[in-house]
Structure formats: structure tokens, C-alpha cells
Amino acid sequence: MKISLILPHQLFYPNPVLSRSRTVFILEDPIFLNDKEYPTRFHKQKIMLHLLSIKCYSDELNEYGYNVKILDSSAIKAPNDYESFFKSNKVSEVHYVDPHDFIVQKRLNKVFKKLRIKSHFYDTPGFINTKDEIDDYFLNKKKFFLTTFYQKERKKLNILINHEGKPVGGKWSYDSENRKKLPKNVKIPPPIKNTYENVDFKNTIEHINSNFKQNYGTTDSFNYPVNRSQAKNALNLFLEKRFLDFGSYEDAISTEHRFIFHSVLSPAMNIGLLTPNEVVSASLDFSDQHSIPINSLEGFIRQIIGWREFIRGIYQVKGVYQRTKNHWNFTKKIPDEFYS
């Protein structure tokens, strides 16, 4: 059997691995939920985000004529279960997007080799740079600097660059203008309220409370986009209601308002419902039409093409080194209070 394999953070529109000639398996990979080899007590709302968004994505693909199957996390709890899945389905060929996860890639490579499965690797739309572009920039460097990387990205992508090849407004970064205190009389837009009538919301909560009892947090205040429509709505509402003042109060904090003028788009971007290219293009287009201040536009763009891509690069070339070292020789666990 030839299959398209999709992971919980690869719910892209469009998805490069999709083909109606292949069965689509959406894998509730344990690395994202409850892995036995690398046990992690993820927050219950992260678990909920994955389970609900996978179900929505599967339903939509089925409506579009794809043959989609969800492989429940209970079927793959240990690394050897990968092999059982591929064997039981007589998989001979796999099309998959770069998981950008060392453990997942290692497990896939192992089973591909052992079972002699032909694999087709696709760069992920979840980042702007390809895997090769990241390697070309980071591999031969001994030190890494965000500022240098960010300026290179701006030039390469021709974002906020004038006809002379210089930064629009005269500065590469307006970070110094992103630090205003929140005035007492400032009007904060109300948070988006997502609804979940079309998903199995109640049963998902019961499933999480039953199977993830020891995980941190609760599902009570869950309010994240779980499908493409909700994610696009979140992007549009940020641009219309918060973008204007995002820059000035980017670093502000409030005991009353959780998000202030922030977009809260990271969850949707990190599971593929929005792509960084899409968010950057939308913000640039909106700014052209609505005269968004440069400190808001540049500050927002910097988070995506600067910080997000930069940290992805560090993970790709130094992730294993960082994960397996303990420079400060710490021995104590992180307190539970950090997750409350």
C-alpha cells in the first residue's frame, strides 16, 4: 500500500503529501501526546488542541474526497509499534512532510530501512526556510546571532526593504519602540470566542480527563482554533483589532488582560492550520491598506521570520547537543508551579 502520513502538527492547507490515489493516515504520534520512551506530562489543553484539530482535519479531507484514517495514539505507544503499523497495513511506500523532530524522524528512518519501505520526503510548509536552507546557513557557524540571521532573511525575502536595499524606516529593528507601559484607560479588544458545536467536544474532554489524569492544567478555558476556518478568523481579527497597537505594547503586561494586543496565532501556526508565509503575507497586505505603524509591522514580522525561523535552525543543527547536555549541572525537577 502507498500512503500519505500526516502528523498532528502537519494539518496544512494545502498539504504537499495529499493525493486521492493514496490512503491518508493521520498519526496521533505519542511524541505529541503520551510517549512511553520520552514521557512528558503535556498540558491538557495541548492534548485537546491536537485531538480536536486532527478530527476536524480528517473530516474535512474526507469531505474533499480523500480516504482518511486516524491512527489513534493507543495503537502506537512504543517505538516498535511503528513497525507493527506499517506491517499490518502492508505499507510499501510513504509520502511524508519533514516532521522537524529528531525522535520521530529517527523512528521513521529505522522502520523504513528495516521493512524496505520507499519514502518520499517533503519540506514542511510550517516554516519559511527549507531544511537545506537552514543547513546552508547554520552548519558551518560556531556562533549564532539572531540579528545577523534576521537581516539576511529580510533581504532574501525582500520584506520591508526599500529600492536601495535598506530597511524601510531606516532601522532593522524597532524593538526599542515595543516597550510602552499599558495605559490605565487603554481599550483592549475582547478575546475571540471559538465555538465547538461541530466537534466531539464533551467526549474529548472526558477522554482527556480519563486518560491524561496526571497531566498539567485543565481543559476548562480551552479557546483555540481547531480548524482552518477558525484559524483564518483568528488571523483576520488580529489584523483588524490588535495589529495597530501590537508594537507599542508588545512587551507590556497586565493583571487583567491575558493577551493584550498579541495575536495568539502560535497554536494555529504550530499545528499547520496557518503557515508563516501566509501570516506574513496577510500582515504585509493589511499594513499596505491600513497604515499600520512600522513598530507594529516590523515587530510582528520579526517574531515570525526572525525568532521563529532562527530557533528552528538552532534546533536543527544543535538540538541533540542542547537536549543531552547539562551545562549548569542542574539536578532538581522544574516545580509544578511553573505549569499552573
Language-model features: where?
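Active-site-adjacent "gating/activation" loops or surface patches in catalytic cores
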Residues: 314, 318-340
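N-terminal beta-strand-loop-alpha-helix module at the start
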Residues: 1-71
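Glycine/tryptophan-enriched, flexible segments
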Residues: 157-300
